[in-house]
Amino acid sequence: MTPELNLKSLGAKTTYIFEYNSQLLEAFPNPNPNLDPLITLECKEFTSLCPITSQPDFGVIFIRYIPKDKMVESKSLKLYLFSYRNHGSFHESCINTILLDLVKLLEPKYLEVYGDFASRGGIAIKPFVNYAIKEYQEFKEKRLLNAK
């Protein structure tokens, strides 16, 4: 029997929000908190707007995390990332905000966000940021040294 999860997005009619909204994120209890899986989530169609020119920016967002007590619900993550569509922000700021919002929601053991943005003006921007609780600081440092 499936426990009551109180999720708002999964299984419901989808309402798309076109402006950044961290309240779209939802979590559910980690069914195996004693394990340390490294979970990878990939959003191949991330878009936001340049805060200066209002031109669209396109990228692939990679989120990797080791959950503690909560895991992110994937449809809510999709809607959250979609909410950046009309949000004006630099690539680095988007990646930092995604990390901070997920850390606040999940309180994970470890979490990283990497953005692989399409070139504009011949330069591709690929920001990486990570977070770890005290027991995972060494892992965090190694991941930072080996970031894409």
Curated annotation (Swiss-Prot):
UniProt entry tagged with the keyword Iron-sulfur: no
Pfam families assigned to the protein according to its UniProt record, in alphabetical order: QueF
List of residues binding substrate: V72, E73, S74, H91, E92
GO cellular component, one term: cytoplasm
Catalysed reaction, written as an equation: 7-aminomethyl-7-carbaguanine + 2 NADP(+) = 7-cyano-7-deazaguanine + 2 NADPH + 3 H(+)
Gene3D superfamilies: 3.30.1130.10
SS bonds (residue pairs): none
Compartment(s): Cytoplasm
Active-site annotation: C50, D57
Gene Ontology MF, one: preQ1 synthase activity
Keywords: Cytoplasm, NADP, Oxidoreductase, Queuosine biosynthesis
Pathway the protein contributes to: tRNA modification; tRNA-queuosine biosynthesis
Domain of life where this protein originates: Bacteria
Presence of keyword Cytoplasm: yes
GO BP terms, alphabetized: queuosine biosynthetic process; tRNA modification
EC number(s) recorded for this UniProt protein: 1.7.1.13
NCBIfam families, alphabetized: QueF-II
Family membership noted in the UniProt record: Belongs to the GTP cyclohydrolase I family. QueF type 1 subfamily.
Job of this protein: Catalyzes the NADPH-dependent reduction of 7-cyano-7-deazaguanine (preQ0) to 7-aminomethyl-7-deazaguanine (preQ1).
Protein name in UniProt: NADPH-dependent 7-cyano-7-deazaguanine reductase
Species of the source: Helicobacter pylori (strain HPAG1)
Gene (name only): queF
